[in-house]
Design a protein with these regions (language model features):
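Hydrophobic side chains within well-formed alpha-helices
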Residues: 2, 6, 56-57
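Conserved hydrophobic/aromatic packing and binding residues within compact polymer-binding modules
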Residues: 6, 20-21, 31-34, 60
Length: 67
């Protein structure tokens, strides 16, 4: 699931939800919804996250296990 990968990547980089929300220019609450599966993640946000973590969108959305 997308939100599990997001949480794992964030924690692997020792970042808080607030850190990532600030980078994405969204509220921490909105990011929390993305990470818990409470909201769908817009493609623009997925692109920014893939760039930030230097990974592919396919990895983020579980289409591959290769980062």
């Amino acid at each position: 699931m997308v939100f599990v990968r997001l949480k794992n990547l964030r924690e692997d980089h020792y970042l808080s939800q607030s850190d990532i929300a600030k980078y994405l220019n969204i509220s921490q609450r909105t990011y929390s919804y993305y990470e818990t599966g409470g909201r769908d993640i817009p493609i623009q946000i997925l692109i920014k996250l893939a760039d930030y973590y230097n990974t592919s969108i396919d990895y983020l959305v579980n289409r591959t296990n290769s980062k």
